[in-house]
Curated annotation (Swiss-Prot):
EC number(s) from the headed UniProt entry: 5.4.99.25
Sorted UniProt keywords: Isomerase, tRNA processing
Function summary: Could be responsible for synthesis of pseudouridine from uracil-55 in the psi GC loop of transfer RNAs.
Membership in a protein family: Belongs to the pseudouridine synthase TruB family. Type 2 subfamily.
Pfam short name (any one): TruB_N
Catalytic residue list: D71
InterPro entries in the cross-refs: Dyskerin-like, PsdUridine_synth_cat_dom_sf, PsdUridine_synth_N, PUA, PUA-like_sf, PUA_sf, tRNA_PsdUridine_synth_B_fam, TruB_arch
GN (gene name): truB
GO molecular function, one term: RNA binding
Domain of life per record: Archaea
The organism of origin for this protein: Korarchaeum cryptofilum (strain OPF8)
Signal peptide from the UniProt entry: none
Protein name: Probable tRNA pseudouridine synthase B
Lineage per the UniProt record: Archaea, Thermoproteota, Candidatus Korarchaeia, Candidatus Korarchaeales, Candidatus Korarchaeaceae
Length: 325
């Protein structure tokens, strides 16, 4: 979770001031505004429909979105973002994905021949989005990282597939069938991982309703804080730069991070890499891009350490301290 051990180097020792909150300690309404739900989407409704259902269950007045659309017939891991966390939608949607699905071949094919075809479709492939897709149907390259044959029963073959975001699994299965000369189709599909989030992180719509009802009826926030995660969970895998309170407000206005604003940072940061810019209380300020490597950030007395890719934190949580940052 958020408190997992990181290898951090201290550049300048500072204690957090009175501003902001540790993510798990945000007041409940602010907690919801920075919320992330890893939903186990059921088969049947569309991703949009289950997102709206979550919004209704929580009686949430703000924005609610989902990251990485699943077709109605597909189940599994679907990140849902609330309020301020919707600013992370594009970032979370860009994660690689992992699925388990059934390929039905329309003719008999020897297992060795099928395995050979799966090898052929591992690596960069060309895909054109389906006719019903919401995006422009231009030919694009997507990477298939692995295809594993889990089991076979007659013409039904259970596969585990790890792919780049934006890869159409139904089209992939169809193309494998065409390559084998017998035709093929997808009979079922479940997403078992979206980036760093797996089935183990998932909650159901029923879990969300139970937690919300418990909170509204008894005032007990414990369940709602378990089914809804702080948005910081989405960046737990990223290298981090922790900044002085005096630097926070300028970052929320899109200013680049200067070396003088750094308190501590993850070891091994490379120039050009994506980093999470954090407050001393562990709040995500922005997604940034490192303009120096770790050693340079640690030793430099001046210069710009990171640029801003996407501001996440609202501007009014930390006061401007331009002269002291």
């Amino acid at each position: 979770m958020i408190d997992e051990v990181e290898e951090i180097a201290v550049k300048s020792a500072y204690e957090p001031g009175p501003y902001g909150y540790r993510p798990q300690e945000r007041p409940i309404f602010l907690y919801l505004d920075h919320g992330l739900i890893i939903l186990d989407k059921p088969k049947g409704p569309s991703s949009h429909e289950v997102t709206e259902r979550v919004k209704r269950i929580l009686e949430y007045p703000g924005k609610v979105g989902h990251c990485g659309t699943l077709d109605p017939k597909v189940s599994g891991v679907l990140p849902i973002v609330l309020g301020n966390a919707t600013k992370l939608s594009k970032f979370i949607s860009g994660y690689d994905k992992e699925y388990v699905g059934t390929l039905y071949l329309h003719g008999d094919v020897p297992i060795d021949e099928l395995k050979g075809a799966l090898d052929k479709f591992t690596g960069p492939i060309f895909q054109r989005p389906p006719v019903k897709s919401a995006v422009k149907r231009s030919l694009r390259v997507r990477r298939v990282y692995s295809i594993e044959l889990l089991s076979s029963e007659g013409r039904f073959h259970k596969l585990r597939v790890r792919v780049e975001s934006g890869t159409y699994i139904r089209k992939l299965f169809f193309d494998i069938g065409e390559f084998l000369g017998v035709g093929g189709s997808m009979r079922d599909l479940r997403r078992i991982r979206s980036g760093i989030f797996t089935e183990k992180d998932c909650v159901t719509l029923e879990d969300i309703k139970d937690a919300y009802d418990s909170w509204r009826e008894s005032g007990d926030e414990s369940k709602i804080r378990k089914v809804i995660l702080p948005l910081e969970e989405a960046v737990r895998h990223l290298p981090k730069i922790y900044v002085k309170d005096s630097a926070v407000a300028s970052l929320t206005h899109g200013a680049s991070l200067k070396v003088k604003g750094i308190c501590s940072l993850s070891r091994g940061i490379k120039k050009g890499s994506i980093v999470a810019l954090m407050t001393l209380k562990g709040e995500l300020i922005a997604i940034g891009r490192a303009l120096m490597d770790f050693d340079e950030m640690l030793s430099a007395d001046s210069g710009v350490a990171a640029s801003i890719e996407r501001v996440i934190m609202p501007r009014d949580l930390y006061p401007p301290m331009w002269k002291t940052g």
